[in-house]
Protein backbone atom coordinates (compact mmCIF):
# COMPACT_ATOMS: atom_id res chain seq x y z
CA UNK A 1 0.00 0.00 0.00
CA UNK A 2 1.32 3.43 -0.91
CA UNK A 3 2.58 5.50 2.01
CA UNK A 4 0.70 8.66 2.87
CA UNK A 5 2.28 12.07 2.54
CA UNK A 6 4.05 12.93 5.80
CA UNK A 7 2.60 16.44 5.89
CA UNK A 8 -0.88 14.98 5.47
CA UNK A 9 -0.19 12.51 8.29
CA UNK A 10 0.58 15.35 10.72
CA UNK A 11 -2.18 17.59 9.37
CA UNK A 12 0.13 20.45 8.38
CA UNK A 13 0.92 22.24 5.12
CA UNK A 14 4.16 21.77 3.17
CA UNK A 15 5.20 25.29 4.10
CA UNK A 16 4.72 24.64 7.83
CA UNK A 17 7.38 25.91 10.23
CA UNK A 18 9.24 23.61 12.62
CA UNK A 19 7.00 24.84 15.45
CA UNK A 20 3.87 24.04 13.43
CA UNK A 21 5.23 20.57 12.64
CA UNK A 22 5.92 19.95 16.33
CA UNK A 23 2.43 21.13 17.29
CA UNK A 24 0.89 18.96 14.58
CA UNK A 25 2.78 15.92 15.85
CA UNK A 26 1.78 16.53 19.46
CA UNK A 27 -1.82 16.91 18.42
CA UNK A 28 -1.78 13.69 16.41
CA UNK A 29 0.14 11.77 19.10
CA UNK A 30 -2.47 12.64 21.71
CA UNK A 31 -5.31 11.88 19.31
CA UNK A 32 -3.95 8.54 18.09
CA UNK A 33 -2.20 7.14 21.17
CA UNK A 34 -3.14 3.44 21.44
CA UNK A 35 -3.85 3.76 25.15
CA UNK A 36 -6.60 6.24 24.36
CA UNK A 37 -7.98 4.24 21.43
CA UNK A 38 -8.11 0.68 22.76
CA UNK A 39 -11.21 -0.12 20.67
CA UNK A 40 -9.66 1.07 17.41
CA UNK A 41 -7.53 -1.65 15.77
CA UNK A 42 -5.93 0.93 13.45
CA UNK A 43 -4.84 3.32 16.19
CA UNK A 44 -1.43 1.75 16.81
CA UNK A 45 -0.52 1.75 13.11
CA UNK A 46 -1.63 5.37 12.74
CA UNK A 47 0.32 6.33 15.85
CA UNK A 48 3.48 4.74 14.41
CA UNK A 49 2.83 6.49 11.10
CA UNK A 50 2.69 9.86 12.89
CA UNK A 51 5.96 9.07 14.70
CA UNK A 52 7.59 8.12 11.41
CA UNK A 53 6.44 11.33 9.76
CA UNK A 54 7.70 13.45 12.64
CA UNK A 55 11.10 11.71 12.70
CA UNK A 56 11.65 12.93 9.13
CA UNK A 57 10.03 16.37 9.18
CA UNK A 58 11.62 17.53 12.45
CA UNK A 59 15.10 17.09 10.97
CA UNK A 60 16.07 19.85 8.51
CA UNK A 61 18.25 17.60 6.32
CA UNK A 62 15.74 14.75 6.18
CA UNK A 63 12.92 17.20 5.53
CA UNK A 64 14.84 18.73 2.62
CA UNK A 65 15.46 15.26 1.16
CA UNK A 66 11.80 14.33 1.57
CA UNK A 67 10.60 17.59 0.00
CA UNK A 68 12.79 16.86 -3.03
CA UNK A 69 12.43 13.11 -3.49
CA UNK A 70 9.45 12.08 -1.38
CA UNK A 71 9.48 8.63 0.23
CA UNK A 72 12.08 7.47 -2.30
CA UNK A 73 14.70 9.43 -0.35
CA UNK A 74 14.50 6.91 2.48
CA UNK A 75 14.13 3.62 0.64
CA UNK A 76 16.80 0.97 1.13
CA UNK A 77 19.26 -0.39 -1.44
CA UNK A 78 20.82 2.91 -2.39
CA UNK A 79 23.90 1.70 -4.19
CA UNK A 80 27.11 0.39 -2.67
CA UNK A 81 28.89 -2.91 -3.28
CA UNK A 82 26.89 -6.10 -3.54
CA UNK A 83 26.73 -9.58 -2.23
CA UNK A 84 27.82 -9.13 1.37
CA UNK A 85 26.39 -11.39 4.03
CA UNK A 86 24.21 -9.81 6.73
CA UNK A 87 26.37 -8.14 9.34
CA UNK A 88 29.52 -8.71 7.28
CA UNK A 89 31.91 -6.40 5.56
CA UNK A 90 34.13 -5.47 8.49
CA UNK A 91 35.11 -8.84 9.89
CA UNK A 92 35.24 -9.99 13.46
CA UNK A 93 31.49 -9.61 13.98
CA UNK A 94 31.81 -6.04 15.34
CA UNK A 95 28.64 -3.98 15.66
CA UNK A 96 29.18 -0.65 13.91
CA UNK A 97 25.56 0.46 14.18
CA UNK A 98 26.19 3.21 16.71
CA UNK A 99 29.12 4.61 14.75
CA UNK A 100 27.17 4.80 11.50
CA UNK A 101 23.60 5.35 12.64
CA UNK A 102 23.73 9.14 12.29
CA UNK A 103 25.16 8.88 8.77
CA UNK A 104 22.69 6.28 7.53
CA UNK A 105 19.66 7.80 9.24
CA UNK A 106 19.50 10.26 6.37
CA UNK A 107 19.65 7.47 3.80
CA UNK A 108 17.42 4.75 5.16
CA UNK A 109 14.76 6.50 7.27
CA UNK A 110 12.72 4.71 9.94
CA UNK A 111 12.75 1.00 10.63
CA UNK A 112 10.37 -0.92 12.83
CA UNK A 113 11.04 -4.20 14.56
CA UNK A 114 14.35 -6.03 14.51
CA UNK A 115 16.83 -6.30 17.35
CA UNK A 116 17.61 -3.64 19.88
CA UNK A 117 20.42 -2.47 22.10
CA UNK A 118 20.71 -0.45 25.25
CA UNK A 119 19.89 3.24 25.49
CA UNK A 120 16.20 3.51 26.34
CA UNK A 121 14.52 3.95 29.70
CA UNK A 122 16.45 7.13 30.40
CA UNK A 123 15.49 10.73 30.86
CA UNK A 124 16.09 13.02 27.89
CA UNK A 125 17.23 16.62 27.80
CA UNK A 126 14.75 19.30 26.76
CA UNK A 127 15.12 21.26 23.53
CA UNK A 128 17.03 24.52 23.33
CA UNK A 129 14.92 27.58 22.56
CA UNK A 130 15.63 30.75 20.59
CA UNK A 131 14.21 34.17 21.45
CA UNK A 132 14.76 37.20 19.19
CA UNK A 133 14.99 40.46 21.13
CA UNK A 134 15.13 43.90 19.51
CA UNK A 135 16.59 46.81 21.47
CA UNK A 136 17.49 50.39 20.53
CA UNK A 137 21.01 51.75 20.11
CA UNK A 138 20.89 53.69 23.37
CA UNK A 139 20.20 50.46 25.29
CA UNK A 140 23.01 48.72 23.42
CA UNK A 141 25.29 51.56 24.52
CA UNK A 142 24.37 51.51 28.20
CA UNK A 143 23.19 47.91 28.72
CA UNK A 144 19.97 47.06 30.52
CA UNK A 145 18.01 44.54 32.55
CA UNK A 146 14.91 43.44 30.63
CA UNK A 147 12.03 41.10 31.42
CA UNK A 148 10.85 38.88 28.57
CA UNK A 149 7.92 36.47 28.31
CA UNK A 150 8.93 33.12 26.84
CA UNK A 151 6.36 30.51 25.74
CA UNK A 152 7.83 27.11 26.56
CA UNK A 153 7.21 23.66 28.00
CA UNK A 154 7.77 23.09 31.71
CA UNK A 155 7.66 19.90 33.74
CA UNK A 156 4.14 18.87 34.74
CA UNK A 157 3.73 19.34 38.49
CA UNK A 158 0.79 16.94 38.69
CA UNK A 159 2.80 13.89 37.62
CA UNK A 160 6.29 15.30 38.35
CA UNK A 161 7.16 14.88 34.69
CA UNK A 162 6.45 11.15 34.49
CA UNK A 163 3.41 11.59 32.23
CA UNK A 164 1.53 8.93 34.18
CA UNK A 165 -1.59 9.42 36.26
CA UNK A 166 -1.14 9.31 40.03
CA UNK A 167 -0.83 5.77 41.35
CA UNK A 168 0.34 4.38 38.00
CA UNK A 169 3.70 4.03 36.32
CA UNK A 170 4.88 3.98 32.70
CA UNK A 171 5.33 0.47 31.29
CA UNK A 172 8.06 -0.96 29.08
CA UNK A 173 7.57 -0.34 25.34
CA UNK A 174 6.65 -3.61 23.56
CA UNK A 175 8.24 -2.57 20.26
CA UNK A 176 11.77 -2.05 21.59
CA UNK A 177 11.46 -4.00 24.87
CA UNK A 178 12.25 -0.86 26.79
CA UNK A 179 15.53 -0.13 25.01
CA UNK A 180 14.36 2.91 23.07
CA UNK A 181 16.16 1.71 19.93
CA UNK A 182 15.31 -0.62 17.06
CA UNK A 183 17.69 -2.10 14.51
CA UNK A 184 17.38 -3.28 10.94
CA UNK A 185 19.80 -4.90 8.54
CA UNK A 186 20.70 -2.99 5.38
CA UNK A 187 23.17 -4.96 3.28
CA UNK A 188 26.53 -4.71 5.03
CA UNK A 189 25.27 -2.51 7.83
CA UNK A 190 23.16 -2.83 10.93
CA UNK A 191 21.35 0.49 11.20
CA UNK A 192 19.99 1.65 14.53
CA UNK A 193 17.19 4.15 14.99
CA UNK A 194 15.03 5.63 17.68
CA UNK A 195 12.00 3.46 18.42
CA UNK A 196 8.98 4.96 16.58
CA UNK A 197 6.50 3.73 19.20
CA UNK A 198 8.00 5.32 22.32
CA UNK A 199 10.17 7.99 20.61
CA UNK A 200 13.27 6.57 22.27
CA UNK A 201 11.98 6.72 25.84
CA UNK A 202 11.68 2.97 26.23
CA UNK A 203 8.33 3.39 27.97
CA UNK A 204 4.68 3.89 27.12
CA UNK A 205 2.00 5.30 29.36
CA UNK A 206 -1.22 3.33 29.76
CA UNK A 207 -2.86 5.81 32.15
CA UNK A 208 -1.75 9.27 30.99
CA UNK A 209 -1.79 12.22 33.37
CA UNK A 210 -4.87 14.34 32.75
CA UNK A 211 -2.98 17.59 33.26
CA UNK A 212 -0.36 16.99 30.57
CA UNK A 213 -2.08 14.24 28.52
CA UNK A 214 0.89 11.96 29.13
CA UNK A 215 3.50 14.36 27.76
CA UNK A 216 5.10 15.00 31.14
CA UNK A 217 5.23 18.68 30.20
CA UNK A 218 2.76 21.53 29.90
CA UNK A 219 2.87 24.72 27.85
CA UNK A 220 3.28 27.94 29.82
CA UNK A 221 4.56 31.49 29.38
CA UNK A 222 7.43 32.34 31.70
CA UNK A 223 8.71 35.79 32.66
CA UNK A 224 12.50 35.84 32.66
CA UNK A 225 14.88 38.65 33.56
CA UNK A 226 17.72 39.07 31.06
CA UNK A 227 20.90 41.05 31.71
CA UNK A 228 21.97 42.67 28.43
CA UNK A 229 25.54 43.97 28.70
CA UNK A 230 26.70 47.25 27.20
CA UNK A 231 28.22 46.93 23.74
CA UNK A 232 25.96 44.23 22.29
CA UNK A 233 25.24 44.36 18.57
CA UNK A 234 22.98 42.61 16.09
CA UNK A 235 23.78 38.90 16.20
CA UNK A 236 25.04 38.87 19.80
CA UNK A 237 23.86 35.68 21.51
CA UNK A 238 23.10 35.43 25.23
CA UNK A 239 22.71 31.96 26.77
CA UNK A 240 20.43 31.30 29.72
CA UNK A 241 21.35 27.81 30.92
CA UNK A 242 18.45 25.56 31.88
CA UNK A 243 15.77 28.00 30.71
CA UNK A 244 14.77 26.07 27.58
CA UNK A 245 12.12 23.37 27.32
CA UNK A 246 11.74 20.95 30.20
CA UNK A 247 13.31 17.53 29.76
CA UNK A 248 11.34 14.35 29.30
CA UNK A 249 10.85 11.98 32.24
CA UNK A 250 12.68 14.26 34.64
CA UNK A 251 15.59 14.97 32.31
CA UNK A 252 17.43 18.31 32.41
CA UNK A 253 15.96 21.35 30.71
CA UNK A 254 17.47 22.76 27.54
CA UNK A 255 18.96 26.24 27.26
CA UNK A 256 17.44 29.50 26.09
CA UNK A 257 19.40 31.58 23.59
CA UNK A 258 18.61 35.29 23.29
CA UNK A 259 19.56 36.70 19.87
CA UNK A 260 19.98 40.47 19.91
CA UNK A 261 18.88 42.78 17.10
CA UNK A 262 19.80 46.45 17.47
CA UNK A 263 17.30 48.70 15.69
CA UNK A 264 18.49 51.37 13.26
CA UNK A 265 18.89 54.86 14.74
CA UNK A 266 17.68 58.09 13.18
CA UNK A 267 20.94 59.96 13.92
CA UNK A 268 23.74 57.42 14.24
CA UNK A 269 25.05 54.60 12.06
CA UNK A 270 27.20 51.92 13.65
CA UNK A 271 30.26 50.05 12.40
CA UNK A 272 31.63 47.85 15.16
CA UNK A 273 32.38 50.15 18.07
CA UNK A 274 32.50 53.29 15.91
CA UNK A 275 29.54 55.60 15.30
CA UNK A 276 28.91 57.90 12.34
CA UNK A 277 26.71 60.98 12.32
CA UNK A 278 25.96 63.03 9.19
CA UNK A 279 25.62 66.72 10.10
CA UNK A 280 24.31 69.37 7.67
CA UNK A 281 26.15 72.72 7.64
CA UNK A 282 25.53 75.89 5.68
CA UNK A 283 27.70 76.98 2.77
CA UNK A 284 28.87 79.96 4.79
CA UNK A 285 29.86 77.80 7.79
CA UNK A 286 31.69 75.35 5.53
CA UNK A 287 33.50 78.19 3.75
CA UNK A 288 34.37 80.26 6.82
CA UNK A 289 34.84 77.43 9.31
CA UNK A 290 33.80 77.53 12.93
CA UNK A 291 32.56 75.42 15.82
CA UNK A 292 29.37 73.33 15.72
CA UNK A 293 27.53 71.34 18.39
CA UNK A 294 26.70 67.68 17.76
CA UNK A 295 24.74 65.02 19.71
CA UNK A 296 26.46 62.04 21.33
CA UNK A 297 24.97 58.59 21.96
CA UNK A 298 25.08 59.04 25.74
CA UNK A 299 22.60 61.92 25.43
CA UNK A 300 25.27 64.57 25.81
CA UNK A 301 26.68 67.19 23.46
CA UNK A 302 30.03 67.47 21.77
CA UNK A 303 31.73 70.28 19.85
CA UNK A 304 33.83 69.98 16.73
CA UNK A 305 35.79 72.62 14.87
CA UNK A 306 35.08 72.87 11.14
CA UNK A 307 38.13 73.98 9.14
CA UNK A 308 37.48 76.77 6.65
CA UNK A 309 36.89 75.59 3.11
CA UNK A 310 35.39 72.23 4.18
CA UNK A 311 33.55 70.19 1.56
CA UNK A 312 30.70 67.68 1.85
CA UNK A 313 31.96 64.31 3.05
CA UNK A 314 34.72 65.68 5.24
CA UNK A 315 34.98 63.79 8.52
CA UNK A 316 36.00 64.90 11.99
CA UNK A 317 36.53 62.58 14.95
CA UNK A 318 35.40 62.67 18.56
CA UNK A 319 37.63 60.11 20.27
CA UNK A 320 36.03 57.72 22.76
CA UNK A 321 32.48 58.82 21.92
CA UNK A 322 31.51 55.62 20.11
CA UNK A 323 30.16 52.34 21.50
CA UNK A 324 31.75 50.43 24.39
CA UNK A 325 33.55 47.18 23.59
CA UNK A 326 31.43 44.17 24.58
CA UNK A 327 34.31 42.25 26.17
CA UNK A 328 36.20 45.15 27.67
CA UNK A 329 38.74 47.51 26.20
CA UNK A 330 38.45 51.08 25.00
CA UNK A 331 35.31 52.53 23.45
CA UNK A 332 35.10 53.36 19.77
CA UNK A 333 35.08 56.83 18.23
CA UNK A 334 32.37 59.00 16.77
CA UNK A 335 32.88 60.39 13.27
CA UNK A 336 31.13 63.56 12.14
CA UNK A 337 30.55 63.71 8.38
CA UNK A 338 29.73 67.13 6.93
CA UNK A 339 26.93 67.62 4.43
CA UNK A 340 27.21 71.12 2.96
CA UNK A 341 23.68 72.36 2.31
CA UNK A 342 22.75 74.57 -0.64
CA UNK A 343 20.26 77.27 0.44
CA UNK A 344 16.73 77.23 -1.02
CA UNK A 345 13.81 79.70 -1.21
CA UNK A 346 16.16 82.67 -1.67
CA UNK A 347 14.94 86.26 -1.51
CA UNK A 348 15.80 88.73 -4.27
CA UNK A 349 18.45 90.33 -2.07
CA UNK A 350 20.04 86.95 -1.29
CA UNK A 351 20.16 86.11 -4.98
CA UNK A 352 21.86 89.45 -5.74
CA UNK A 353 24.46 88.85 -3.03
CA UNK A 354 25.15 85.31 -4.24
CA UNK A 355 25.52 86.50 -7.83
CA UNK A 356 27.94 89.17 -6.69
CA UNK A 357 29.81 86.61 -4.59
CA UNK A 358 30.05 84.26 -7.57
CA UNK A 359 31.64 87.00 -9.70
CA UNK A 360 34.19 87.65 -6.98
CA UNK A 361 35.05 83.98 -6.32
CA UNK A 362 36.41 82.95 -9.70
CA UNK A 363 39.69 81.83 -8.17
CA UNK A 364 38.20 80.38 -4.98
CA UNK A 365 36.87 77.11 -6.41
CA UNK A 366 39.95 75.03 -7.33
CA UNK A 367 38.04 71.79 -7.82
CA UNK A 368 35.61 73.41 -10.26
CA UNK A 369 38.46 75.11 -12.12
CA UNK A 370 40.34 71.81 -12.41
CA UNK A 371 37.25 69.96 -13.61
CA UNK A 372 36.31 72.44 -16.32
CA UNK A 373 39.91 72.67 -17.45
CA UNK A 374 39.86 68.90 -17.97
CA UNK A 375 36.55 69.16 -19.82
CA UNK A 376 38.00 71.80 -22.17
CA UNK A 377 41.04 69.62 -22.87
CA UNK A 378 38.77 66.66 -23.60
CA UNK A 379 36.65 68.63 -26.08
CA UNK A 380 39.75 70.04 -27.78
CA UNK A 381 41.16 66.53 -28.21
CA UNK A 382 37.90 65.35 -29.79
CA UNK A 383 38.08 68.12 -32.38
CA UNK A 384 41.51 67.00 -33.48
From Swiss-Prot:
Zn(2+) 2 binds at residues 173, 176, 195, 198. Zn(2+) 1 binds at residues 156, 159, 209, 212. Belongs to the DnaJ family. Its main location: cytoplasm. Residues 16-47 are annotated as: Disordered. Gene3D superfamilies: DnaJ domain (1.10.287.110), Heat shock protein DnaJ, cysteine-rich domain (2.10.230.10), Urease metallochaperone UreE, N-terminal domain (2.60.260.20). InterPro entries: DnaJ, DnaJ_C, DnaJ_domain, DnaJ_domain_CS, HSP40/DnaJ_pept-bd, HSP_DnaJ_Cys-rich_dom, HSP_DnaJ_Cys-rich_dom_sf, J_dom_sf. Homodimer. GO terms for biological process: chaperone cofactor-dependent protein refolding; DNA replication; protein refolding; response to heat. One of its GO terms (molecular function) is heat shock protein binding. This is Chaperone protein DnaJ. Its cofactor is Zn(2+). The J domain is necessary and sufficient to stimulate DnaK ATPase activity. Zinc center 1 plays an important role in the autonomous, DnaK-independent chaperone activity of DnaJ. Zinc center 2 is essential for interaction with DnaK and for DnaJ activity. A zinc finger (CR-type) spans 143-221. Residues 31-47 have a biased composition (Basic and acidic residues). HAMAP family: DnaJ (MF_01152). Pfam families: DnaJ, DnaJ_C, DnaJ_CXXCXGXG. It comes from the Bacteria. It is found in: Cytoplasm. Residues 5-70 form the J domain. GO terms for cellular component: cytoplasm. Participates actively in the response to hyperosmotic and heat shock by preventing the aggregation of stress-denatured proteins and by disaggregating proteins, also in an autonomous, DnaK-independent fashion. Unfolded proteins bind initially to DnaJ; upon interaction with the DnaJ-bound protein, DnaK hydrolyzes its bound ATP, resulting in the formation of a stable complex. GrpE releases ADP from DnaK; ATP binding to DnaK triggers the release of the substrate protein, thus completing the reaction cycle. CXXCXGXG motif repeats lie at residues 156-163, 173-180, 195-202, 209-216.
